[in-house]
UniProtKB/Swiss-Prot annotation:
Residues 94-170 form the PUA domain. Keywords: Cytoplasm, Nucleus, Ribosome biogenesis, RNA-binding. GO terms for biological process: assembly of large subunit precursor of preribosome; maturation of LSU-rRNA from tricistronic rRNA transcript (SSU-rRNA, 5.8S rRNA, LSU-rRNA); ribosomal large subunit biogenesis. Its main location: cytoplasm. Interacts with NOP8 and RRP43. Interacts with pre-ribosome complex. May bind to RNA. It is found in: Cytoplasm; Nucleus, Nucleolus. This is 60S ribosome subunit biogenesis protein NIP7. The keyword Transferase does not apply. Belongs to the NIP7 family. One of its GO terms (cellular component) is nucleus. It holds the Pfam family pre-PUA_NIP7. The gene is NIP7. Present with 5170 molecules/cell in log phase SD medium.
């Protein structure tokens, strides 16, 4: 497990900024419980600093996981967020969409968010911005990218796509064989 290089840090922060914006400072500058970003087998982990120091005594081949897995780097060098990062993203989300109970199951089965399923949404969502999808009782269900801005979404047909799904908590069951390998 090693620290991220300057280039890797830039790529990770750009991806995170798409979902949490300037709130990324809360991840980095937490005085009460400082956290660090670590890389292990192309996966980026968000780890409390004191735990990362303890992990230095474990050999790399023996270390499976540590902290919260935010995502992984692809072979082409791009960073892809993982569903396990949802707890971090939801806490500091900039743009949010709440879906009605009748839209939860279709979303958890891997479908996009439709206009008919939207209960409420943030007022200032631009087009193609990262959004966090919540149930009406504020339980985070996943994240994606907005298909239209908030003002355009209000005038859509009920079958129109409001947000493209990128990850949802249903992946824990659908991809349980390959999720942590």
């Amino acid at each position: 497990m090693r620290q991220l290089t300057e280039e890797e840090t830039k790529v990770v922060f750009e991806k995170l900024a798409g979902y949490i914006g300037r709130n990324i400072s809360f991840l980095v500058d937490n005085k009460e419980l400082p956290h660090v970003f670590r890389l292990q087998k192309d996966r980026v982990y968000y780890v409390p600093d004191h735990v990362a120091k303890l992990a230095t005594s474990v050999a790399r081949p023996n270390l499976m996981s540590l902290g919260i897995c935010l995502g992984k780097f692809t072979k082409t060098g791009k960073f892809r967020l993982h569903i396990t990062s949802l707890t971090v993203l939801a806490k500091h989300a900039k743009y949010k969409i709440w879906i009605k109970p009748n839209g939860e199951m279709p979303f958890l089965y891997g479908n996009h968010v439709l206009k008919a399923h939207v209960g409420k949404m943030s007022d200032d969502i631009p087009e193609h911005a990262g959004v966090i999808v919540f149930a009406m009782n504020d339980v985070p269900l996943g994240f994606g990218v907005s298909a239209k801005s908030t003002s355009e979404s209000r005038n859509m047909q009920p079958t129109g796509i409001v947000a493209f799904r990128q990850a949802d908590i249903g992946e824990y069951l659908r991809d349980e064989d390959t999720l942590f390998t």
